[in-house]
């Protein structure tokens, strides 16, 4: 991830930062780096995302695997901007994308996905790309602003998607 994202050469600019997060899931290791910009009003733009995972010994369909990586990142970023509302005694209020939308195309950054093949048994690769994007982005926001995001959605911490 360090090489692909240019981590060692990242510039120290006000309002710009990179963050990393990693985790172990489905018998594989996954890491993501996010590069973000934050303006004076707290509007966050994710400029680029790099995602990588150790998914075992074989990938049957590389194009589908890459698409699943994209989907996990986009879905995870979407969850950062809103929360699920529960109505007492009725369950979840949101019923579909009209009242719980995913990111719009203009908000989706360039995403690079890399899979590392190892001698381990094949593992899942779609779902494990979702969780690390949340701390990768919030760590990047901290690098850009000095302010930690400890509560989601972003609006609860004074930020929102640009």
Language model feature labels by segment:
Residues 32-36:
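Short beta-strand scaffold segments in enzyme catalytic cores
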């Amino acid at each position: 991830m360090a090489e692909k994202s240019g981590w060692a050469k990242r510039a120290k600019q006000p309002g710009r930062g990179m963050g990393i997060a990693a985790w172990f899931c489905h018998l594989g290791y996954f890491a993501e780096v996010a590069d973000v910009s934050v303006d004076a009003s707290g509007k966050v733009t994710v400029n680029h995302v790099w995602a990588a995972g150790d998914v075992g010994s074989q990938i049957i369909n590389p194009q589908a695997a890459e698409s699943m990586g994209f989907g996990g990142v986009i879905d995870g970023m979407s969850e950062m901007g809103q929360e699920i509302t529960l109505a007492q005694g009725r369950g979840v209020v949101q019923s579909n994308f009209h009242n719980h939308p995913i990111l719009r195309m203009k908000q989706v950054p360039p995403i690079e996905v890399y899979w590392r093949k190892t001698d381990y048994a094949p593992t899942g690769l779609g779902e494990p790309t979702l969780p690390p994007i949340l701390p990768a982005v919030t760590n990047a926001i901290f690098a850009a602003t000095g302010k930690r995001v400890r509560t989601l959605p972003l609006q609860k911490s004074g930020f929102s998607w640009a």
